[in-house]
Amino acid sequence: MASPDLSNAYNGRIDLGSLANNASINRALNDMPTAVDDAGVRPQPPIDLTAAAFFDVDNTLVQGSSAVHFGRGLAARDYFTYRDVLGFIYAQAKFQLLGKENSQDVAAGQRKALAFIEGRSVEQLVALGEEIYDEIIADKIWAGTRQLTQIHLDAGQQVWLITATPYELAATIARRLGLTGALGTVAESVDGIFTGRLVDELLHGVGKAHAVRSLAIREGLNLKRCTAYSDSYNDVPMLSLVGTAVAINPDAQLRSLARERGWEIRDFRTARKAARIGVPSALALGGALAAAVSRRRDRE
């Protein structure tokens, strides 16, 4: 089995002027002083200054795709056409049935998302993210993964979400869970309005490793003392960058590699349960979104 190319992630030469995903890191660090969790508590400064934990979001912390859950909330508010809804149904069904993400699917979804937010205000999208977190995403948090984040927090370590999910949504999830922050894909905005373009590359695959490495430099972290968690083989570059890698709800390729490398595996699903709920839950999503579109058509 061939592993993803890690050469870029391990380049020992550091150019502080060209660190990857600066936009995501800058946004996250700028937002940290104002972040408070659901209890209104601001995360405490870390006691252990050189160790941190990095968590992927989709299927690692959140059951399924956080962007699709966000899409469900938007569909319920009549933001989508029938064609858009079919795309969400397909993405969710494929994600649940195959148990892994596809780079092309992620990129295609990102393009659609950028087209959707173009011309909309950042404030509006953040507010929608808050509402949809309460309505849908909060109930999709894997309890086991949530406990792992708390273990690191209790140890006085920074805990970061590292995800291709749009920064605004990722930051909302991190803040509501009392985590240190989130690195996500950053969409460009001018005067508070999204332009429909990205500031940096999609935060996915090797890009996550670049971002973690850059964050470690900024925060003075020792990557050998850090831990990373993911469900996806696409995140092997990030998992390989730290001292401790943990496969959470892993896809088949990651499970095989984790066994080969002696990485810990934690599966908060069961094979029987995953097989049983995969298709029905995808169909339920399709029914819910189709109903939303039908209501919209009736009104039109």
From Swiss-Prot:
One Pfam family hit: HAD
Top-level taxonomic group: Bacteria
Cofactor binding, note field: Binds 1 Mg(2+) ion per subunit.
Catalytic residues identified in the record: D56, D58
The entry's keywords: Hydrolase, Magnesium, Metal-binding
EC number: 3.1.-.-
Top-level EC class: hydrolase
SUPFAM superfamilies documented for this protein: HAD-like
Entry annotated with the keyword Hydrolase: yes
Residues where Mg(2+) binds: D56, D58, D231
Protein name: Putative hydrolase ML2424
Naturally occurring in which organism (per UniProt): Mycobacterium leprae (strain TN)
